Curated annotation (Swiss-Prot):
GO MF entry, a single one: xenobiotic transmembrane transporter activity
Known partners and oligomeric status: Part of a tripartite efflux system composed of MdtA, MdtB and MdtC. MdtB forms a heteromultimer with MdtC.
Entry-linked Pfam families: ACR_tran
Protein name: Multidrug resistance protein MdtB
Gene, per the UniProt record: mdtB
Length: 1040
């Protein structure tokens, strides 16, 4: 049995000090749980914070934007608008395509949203056009999310129609079945089909019309049930040659008889194997390709999903002919893994730096080993809790652990330093551990809970930003709690077992030199502190000036939302004149692609032209530029973008918009630039009046660059003005006119060919090669009442007009989206304020509304809540400290250190040229928790000296400052060095980590210098104030 000195209670640490084996096994259990938990943690770029988003796509080839809006989009919107939990509904109706994007509240499960969407589509079915080729198709993806993986399928021996058929049936379906895949899209549009190109002159000479041909084809190709025969002994299934499956069969089809002679389809049309839509095309590095974009489901594990796809690719490619090549052009997980690896390295570097600082101060290997064990144990133990909470290894949780390195060592340092002090005075190690741990136990508890209190407001942040930082805050809080447990259990036990007077007194030349240096520093600090205490009002003036300076810096510093990351992938939009055709766009993308691929930083490029639901209009093309790895190129992504735009600028009549892809996607539609602002009206006419005015005003603002809008109302349209009286007299209905036009120019899908593996379409159109443009309309013939044919020009007048290329809605009303970037030298906050000022200047009417979208809207919300977030952190800490100290006064003394941290952080951000964004604000909030530690350590010892030794407040705080100077300096440097790797990071994802490191290092440097002098002065000021209150209200025996 161990003999304990009287009074050596040890507080909460007593049991663990006296039972070292049990303590060791308990810590081993924490370590083992953390190691096992780490193996089960998924890897991601950021915490999963996706809004539940569903996209509904309806294709109606040949329909104008106006027809798509009124007959497809509007009926769907009316049903979708009745769904509960819907946050925002946007739609885009263009030629032949309607896309409705539904964004739901964060609290609504995606499966519930899916059920509501399916029910709404079913309810709208009867209102949709009866001749839709396919019903509306929904997918659980955010269209603005960049694909997690892009694959290109090429062949130098096979036509693209055959390649797409194989990819669709053998590859895309298998990838779609992978867990986590939300949607696999094939860009390139080369689905096989039988194309029937009518010769207008030939059918007119025979007295036929396109409707006659269409009816003949649809009647000749069917695939329906025919029944069976059931006899006394045998059953027979009925079958027939009702399907035609080759172009040759269609050529031989008899469509009419003239003077008893058959007229075959091949006589009046060119029938060939081709693509279902001839106005779609994709290229990979300028070679024709089928491009597969794989998007994940919201909430899916991106790393696990990509790994599953890569594992099955070899098996899938083996099923394809050797001439077909499948190439992975981009894989977002490559950069995610690199970013996580860099952050893990910075975490290990932070641990090494912290241990180095410990050794520099303690100059004793056993004393250094103790916190050297406490730090990794606290961090590894956190993994076990992260698994339980369904967290992931991502940039934010790793940043939390890196910052925690400086936090968790603080507790161990404070305990070791206090126990070592008693051992050096001659106490036995066991007695010193019990006495030192018992004395410091309340301080550890105060430090822990006051620091966790700072993180509490982060847990209550609303919307997507709150979800984003919940994992960060909880991970850090768990690490701090485990650190407190380790510091009150393992650390004093190890001190009792490993420290001794001999080990602490054993010094070499380096130790003695460091000791002399520290003694001189403490002596200099003592002299300076004495002078400061003799001139308190000057010190208070400095503290007040610091507060004012922090407010001023907060006002002037540029403000942003989220750091722009370099993920190695650039999304682009190529814009051409609104009347551009598919052929001209294909030629322009080739010119642009040639110049982009010449850039040394570009690794691969995919381009797409055509309208397919993802690309809204024919005069725009989509690009995805994949850059070389960061260590293989000299420039960051923004420099590459500037260089590419300069290279393309000399190509006439095209505009290239580029933006880097981001891990955090808040938008619900693909934009030309990073930020969006919408203008909404009740009618298209009102919108057309105000869009040019606002766009011109925005383009003149220096705070904005690359301003553009999706308002396109100058597309060419041929208006067929039918003379209804003349048409009626001839027995021709408006439906007949529409059918004739659709047959000729709509790439009309008139029949379906069924096979065992897939279904293919028969496409009807006029061969317009000999009569291009509006002249082709003159070849249209219609059947009159007497059976003859009438030219369209006999009953209609053709006019050329301007019409919108697409019609966009936001919550069922017409809307235009303005896209913009922020030029160098300005911040997002500057741009937002400039837009708001412009809006006031224009004096928009009441029926015109504006709203920021996506990340700009989130920035506004975050900016409005930032001040309240910091205030909430301060109030939470005050409440916790007030409860712990049973005092209204001492928490104020501790919190008086906070302005110094704010000044240092803001100055560091300004000097580094960094914006005050969400990451930097989190750093400032963490500083609130770190900086107050200095004051807590001073005040705890001062109060103990007053209470136990009867010292005066001045002598008590003076002695406390000198006694706690070394641990204060040690813990501050540990926290600083824990943040230093983040500040100096240069690898993948460094843009995300650097603002946090800059804010924390700057705040710690300034606050360390100032709080050592301002805290004791403020302590004495409030002590006098407390005495004054007691003298005025003597009935209050206890401190108010």
């Amino acid at each position: 049995m161990q003999v304990l000195p009287p009074g050596s209670t040890g507080g909460p640490s007593r049991l663990f000090i006296l039972r070292p084996v049990a303590t060791t096994l308990l810590m081993a259990a924490i370590l083992l749980a953390g190691i096992i938990g780490y193996r089960f943690l998924p890897v991601a770029a950021l915490p999963e914070v996706d809004y539940p988003t569903i996209q509904v796509v309806t294709l109606y080839p040949g329909a104008s934007p106006d027809v798509m809006t009124s007959s497809v989009t509007a009926p769907l919107e009316r049903q979708f608008g009745q769904m509960s939990g819907l946050k925002q509904m946007s739609s885009q109706s263009s030629g032949g395509a309607s896309v409705v994007t539904l964004q739901f509240q964060l609290t609504l499960p995606l499966d519930v949203a899916e059920q509501e969407v399916q029910a709404a589509i079913n309810a709208a079915t009867n209102l949709l056009p009866s001749d839709l080729p396919n019903p509306p198709i929904y997918s659980k993806v955010n269209p603005a999310d960049p694909p997690i993986m892009t694959l290109a399928v090429t062949s130098n021996a096979m036509p693209m129609t055959q390649v797409e058929d194989m990819v669709e049936t053998r590859v895309a379906q298998k990838i779609s079945q992978v867990s986590g895949v939300g949607l696999v899209t094939l860009a390139g549009g080369q689905r096989p089909a039988i194309r029937v190109k009518l010769n207008a002159q030939a059918i007119a000479a025979l007295g036929l019309t396109s409707e006659t041909v269409r009816t003949a084809i649809t009647g000749a190709n069917v695939n329906s049930a025919k029944g069976s025969l059931d006899g006394p002994e045998r059953a027979v299934t009925l079958s027939a040659n009702d399907q035609m499956q080759s172009a040759d069969e269609y050529r031989k089809l008899i469509i009419a008889y003239q003077n008893g002679a058959p007229v075959r389809l091949g006589d009046v049309a060119t029938v060939e194997q081709g693509a279902e839509n001839s106005w779609l095309g994709a290229w990979a590095n300028q070679a024709p390709a089928i491009v597969m974009n794989v998007q994940r489901q919201p909430g899916a594990n991106i790393i696990a999903t990509a790994d599953s796809i890569r594992q099955m690719l070899p098996q899938l490619t083996e099923s394809l002919p050797k001439s077909v090549k499948v190439t992975v052009l981009s894989d977002r997980t490559t950069n995610i893994r690199a970013s996580v690896r860099d952050t893990q390295f910075e975490l290990m570097l932070a641990i090494a730096l912290v241990v180095m600082i410990i050794y520099l101060f303690l100059r004793n290997i056993p004393a250094t080993i103790i916190p050297g064990v406490a730090v990794p144990l606290s961090l590894i133990g956190t993994f076990a809790v992260m698994v339980f909470l369904d967290f992931s290894i991502n940039n934010l949780t790793l940043m939390a652990l890196t910052i925690a390195t400086g936090f968790v060592v603080d507790d161990a340092i404070v305990v070791i330093e206090n126990i070592s002090r008693y051992i050096e005075k001659g106490e036995k190690p066991l007695a010193a551990a019990l006495k030192g741990a018992g004395e410091i136990g309340f301080t550890i508890i105060s430090l822990t809970f006051s620091l966790i209190a700072v993180l509490i407001p982060l847990l209550f942040m609303g919307d997507i930003v709150g979800r984003l930082f919940r994992e960060f805050a909880v991970t850090l809080a768990v690490a701090i709690l485990i650190s407190a447990v380790v510091s009150l259990t393992l650390t004093p036990m190890m001190c009792a077992c490993m420290l001794s007077q001999q080990s602490l007194r054993k010094q070499n030349r380096f130790s003695r030199a460091c000791e002399r240096m520290f003694d001189r520093v403490i002596a200099s600090y003592g002299r300076g502190l004495a002078k400061v205490l003799n001139h308190p009002w000057l010190t208070l003036s400095v503290a007040f000036a610091t507060l004012l300076l922090s407010v001023m810096l907060w006002i002037v510093i540029p403000k942003g939302f989220f750091p722009v990351q370099d993920n190695g992938i650039i999304q682009g939009t190529l814009q051409a004149p609104q009347s551009s055709s598919y052929a001209s766009m294909a030629q322009r993308q080739r010119q642009v692609a040639e110049r982009i691929l010449q850039d040394p930083a570009v690794q691969s490029l995919t381009t797409f032209v055509g309208v397919d639901g993802a690309n809204p209009t024919l005069n725009s093309a989509r690009l995805q530029i994949n850059l070389k790895p960061l260590d293989a190129r000299d420039d960051r992504v923004q420099q590459v973008i500037s260089r590419l735009q300069t290279a393309v600028a000399t190509i006439p009549v095209v505009a290239l918009y580029l933006q880097p892809t981001q891990d955090l996607t808040i938008d619900t539609q693909v934009s030309r630039t990073q930020y969006q602002f919408t203008l909404q009206a009740t009618t298209l006419d009102a919108l057309s009046h105000w869009v040019p005015k606002l766009q011109n005003a925005l383009q003149s603002l220096p705070q904005l660059s690359e301003v553009s809008s999706d308002w396109q109302d100058r597309g060419l349209a041929a208006w067929v003005n039918v003379d209804r009286d003349s048409a009626s007299r001839l027995g021709i209905s408006i439906a007949d006119v529409d059918n004739a036009l659709y047959n000729a120019f709509g790439q009309r899908l008139i029949s379906t060919i069924y096979t065992q593996a897939n279904q293919y379409r028969v496409v009807l159109e006029h061969n317009t090669a000999s009569t291009p443009g509006l002249a082709a309309l003159e070849t249209i013939r219609l059947t009159s009442r007497d059976g003859g044919t009438v030219s369209l020009s006999a009953i209609a007048r053709i006019e050329q007009r301007f019409a919108p290329l697409s019609i966009n809605h936001l919550d069922q009303f017409p809307v235009t989206t303005f896209s913009f970037n922020v030029p160098e030298g300005y911040s997002l906050g500057d741009a937002v304020q400039a837009i708001l000022d412009t809006e006031k200047t224009l004096a928009l009417p009441a029926d015109i509304t504006t709203q920021f979208q996506g990340s700009t809207l989130a920035f506004q919300a975050a900016l409005g809540s930032t001040v309240w977030l910091i205030v909430a952190a301060v109030v939470a800490m005050y409440i916790v400290l007030g409860v712990l100290y049973e005092s209204f006064i001492h928490p104020i003394t501790i919190l008086s250190t906070l302005p110094t941290a704010g000044v240092g952080a803001l100055l560091a951000l300004i000097i580094a040229g960094s914006e005050l964004d969400i990451i930097a604000i989190i750093g400032i909030i963490l500083l609130i928790g770190i900086v107050k530690k200095n004051a807590i350590m001073m005040i705890d010892f001062a109060l103990a000296a007053e209470r136990e030794q009867g010292m005066s407040p001045r002598d008590a705080i003076f002695q406390a400052c000198l006694l706690r100077f070394r641990p204060i300096l040690m813990t501050t440097l540990a926290a600083l060095l824990g943040a230093l790797p983040l500040m100096l990071s240069t690898g993948v994802g460094a843009e995300l980590r650097r603002p946090l490191g800059i804010a924390m290092v700057g705040g710690l440097l300034v606050s360390q210098v100032l709080t050592l002098f301002t805290t004791p002065v403020i302590y004495l000021l409030f002590d006098r104030l407390s005495l004054y209150v007691k003298s005025r209200f003597p009935r209050h025996k206890e401190e108010a």
